[in-house]
């Protein structure tokens, strides 16, 4: 798979990201929107937001080459928990065109929130996945009276 950066920008957290990251509305955030493809076939669009201060010189990093998680590691941010929320939606306009889909086509939507051991949110990503590439497996286990659900996207 390869990655094409569609846009990057620095912005204020605003209401949405201040609630997700538990920071004031005017906190600086960095946003990366990437198109993921395999063999020149669009797979997904990822809209990732991180705290601007979390990665040194973040504007200068080529995220088509370097992994966000490598940059976290270099900047001593250790991800402890990754939460995925799967839902369905439809895609329109530019996103539909980039994914090679018709207007209003269904997609699988995944919200990803990565946190450190201290519970600090390091990343929020919204992913729109072409259904042909959105197969996932879930498994539920009851252990000591507690239900645990795991899932895997493949």
Kindly give the residue locations of the regions a language model identified.
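C-terminal all-alpha effector/ligand-binding and dimerization domain
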Residues: 2-154
């Amino acid at each position: 798979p390869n990655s094409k950066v569609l846009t990057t920008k620095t912005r204020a957290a605003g209401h949405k990201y201040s609630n997700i990251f538990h920071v004031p509305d005017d906190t600086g955030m960095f946003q990366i929107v990437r198109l993921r493809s395999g063999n020149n076939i669009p797979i997904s669009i990822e809209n990732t937001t991180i705290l601007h201060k979390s990665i040194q010189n973040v504007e200068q990093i080529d995220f088509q080459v370097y992994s966000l998680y490598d940059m976290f590691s270099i900047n001593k941010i250790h991800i402890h928990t990754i939460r995925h929320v799967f839902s369905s939606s439809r895609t329109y306009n530019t996103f539909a065109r980039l994914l090679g889909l018709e207007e209003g086509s269904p997609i699988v939507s995944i919200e990803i929130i990565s946190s450190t051991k201290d519970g600090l949110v390091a990343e929020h990503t919204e992913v729109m996945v072409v259904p042909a590439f959105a197969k996932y497996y879930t498994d539920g286990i009851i252990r000591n009276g507690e239900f645990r659900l795991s899932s895997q996207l493949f």
